Amino acid sequence: MSTKYELKNLATGKTSPLNAIAGTIGPEALDISNLIKEQGVFTFDPGFMATASTESKITFIDGDLGVLLYRGYPVEQLAEKSCFLEVANLLIYGTLPSKAQLDAFQKSILRHTMVNEQLLRFFQGFHHNAHPMAMVSAVVASMAAFYHDTTDIDDPRHREIFAHRIIAKLPTIAAAAYKHTLGQPFVYPRNDLRYCANRSEEHTSELQSH
């Protein structure tokens, strides 16, 4: 962090130094957190078009240039060369996994694909033509009531387990919402299938049986 800029009130002559924060990529950011105390003013930036609201070690985006990076990798490269769970592993742990690491990660995810039966009963309270996203949002929001052993955001292990759970269970919940709109019975996940194959099985198996 370095002080290369300052803001001056032309009416009073009072100046405030603005520290520049250099990111790994992209333009510098100015630390304006002391302006309200020193100058008695806020900044006005509708839509935060020129404001970085936080630091991120995961994502860099430049909409004007069409750039989207995850952990330094272009999103188009990840889409072309990596599977979903490889990218999920990258986002959580910071590096692309080795084969052994990916196998262990997939094993952990598959172990968490089942959803508590009482949680699935939530769908019985939704109308058959309810929007799937509304149903999924409601059920996901209720997960903390069933899996409350890993809700300490300050505990790295809790965050890791909950990340694995949400990656594993969200497709199961989404499939349940889809089946509910069709009036078809829920199809349980199969741990003998890979992650994406399981998603296809849960969505289409009942349709294929007719």
What is the role of each PLM region?
Residues 206-210:
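Positively charged, low-complexity/disordered segments
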Residues 2-205:
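Hydrophobic alpha-helical bundle cores within soluble ligand-binding/oligomerization subdomains
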